[in-house]
A protein has these predicted regions:
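Membrane-interfacial helix termini and the short, flexible loops that connect transmembrane helices
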Residues: 20-24, 52-57, 205, 214, ...
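Active-site-adjacent "gating/activation" loops or surface patches in catalytic cores
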Residues: 183-221, 310, 322
Length: 355
């Protein structure tokens, strides 16, 4: 990945220099469209690298990420803080009313200009250098946060050695847990914090103590006294985001983020959330009451429903009320069936054939 990423950076730098050094007056084609088409190789490589880092990472990829991410952050800053490049973008933007652009071109121009502004192009002097420093720092912090979360998730394992501990679990989940244990030369059944293991266990396992153990492990990730603790990292991320937002003239990071979203501001978000809260609360309270009643019928009137009980008893209630069990649906969503459905639909709608 590293040679390809470095080559991608080199290619995009050459493409950006070509835009800047173009002797012709800045226009949509030679500036906005040319900028949009730059960095094709880098985009392709970083997309693959990012997906692999998220879905199938290892120590080598994580070490490479620590090296590559600051380079990518620096490269991004070198583009958006390039005064000559922004001058050309701004020149085109300022004459947008006279360019007779179609809707797609107008949107592209608007996005390009706003992206430069949102990434510090209007900053000057010390403020510009401070923005560069803060964004580089934020890139490192967010990468560390993600890596800690991933490592903490990967290192946890709940190994069960007694068959009775598996009561309630579908056979396919039991088999998968046995395979996980076997892959590490262990006897028994290993359950992890990864969704394919965690979610079914919380939904079907009869053993409440084990549900609690797994739930607490999942919900206290990166808070323990070890090298993966993210508490201080989160504080630093929040503070750095606040500094970036205020440097760019916003009240806080929420305002900075929401400007380009449908909600536009924090007040709209809170208004919607409060409307939803008011609308959903009666239904949520009724559902909670039903789940609690079902649990108490099984466990006694003194039973108190806890977070690690919710998935288990709400699934039981769903099965009881609607006779729907997710395990009944599993054969319909087996990988090959899903592939047939998705690819078949693409062929039917768009005439695209996958082989």
């Amino acid at each position: 990945y590293e040679p390809a990423i470095l080559e991608g950076i080199k290619q995009q730098n050459a493409e950006i220099n070509a835009i800047i050094q173009n002797p012709e007056k800045a226009d949509f084609r030679n500036t906005i469209e040319a900028f949009e088409q730059s960095g094709e190789l880098l985009d392709r490589v970083t997309a693959v690298f990012g997906n692999m880092l998220s879905a199938e990472t290892n120590d080598d990829l994580q070490a490479l990420a620590q090296k590559i991410m600051p380079l990518l952050s620096e490269h991004s800053n070198n583009i958006t803080l390039n005064e000559k490049l922004f001058a050309r973008v701004k020149e085109v933007y300022n004459q947008k009313e006279n360019l007779q652009l179609n809707p797609e071109e107008s949107k592209l121009l608007e996005n390009a200009y706003n992206s430069f502004v949102r990434h510090g192009a209007n900053l000057e002097g010390e403020a510009r250098e401070e923005y560069r420093r803060l964004t580089t720092e934020l890139s490192k912090l967010t990468l560390t946060f993600s890596e800690n979360n991933l490592k903490e998730t990967n290192r946890y394992q709940m190994l069960l050695t007694k068959k009775e501990s598996l009561a309630g679990l579908p056979e396919i989940i039991v088999e998968a847990a046995a395979e996980t244990a076997k892959s590490e030369d262990k006897e028994g059944w290993a359950f992890t914090l990864h969704a394919p293991s965690y979610v079914p266990f919380m939904t079907y396992a009869d053993n409440r103590d084990l549900r609690q153990r797994l739930y607490m492990a999942y919900n206290t990730k990166c808070t323990h006294d070890n090298e993966f603790n993210n508490i201080e990292i989160v504080k630093k991320i929040a503070n750095t985001r606040m500094k970036i937002a205020q440097l760019l003239g916003y009240k806080d990071y929420a305002e900075y983020t929401l400007v380009k979203r449908m909600a536009e501001n924090s007040e709209s978000v809170y208004k919607l959330l409060n409307q939803l809260l008011e609308a959903y609360t009666p239904t949520a309270q009724q559902e909670y009451k039903e789940v609690q009643e079902l649990a108490r019928k099984e466990q006694g009137e003194d039973f108190v429903l806890m977070p690690w009980d919710w998935s288990y008893y709400s699934n039981k209630l769903k099965d009881k009320k609607f006779n729907i069990n997710e395990e009944m649906l599993r054969p319909y969503f087996e990988l090959e069936q899903v592939k047939k459905g998705v690819f078949g639909l693409a062929e039917k709608l768009y005439g695209i054939t996958f082989r």
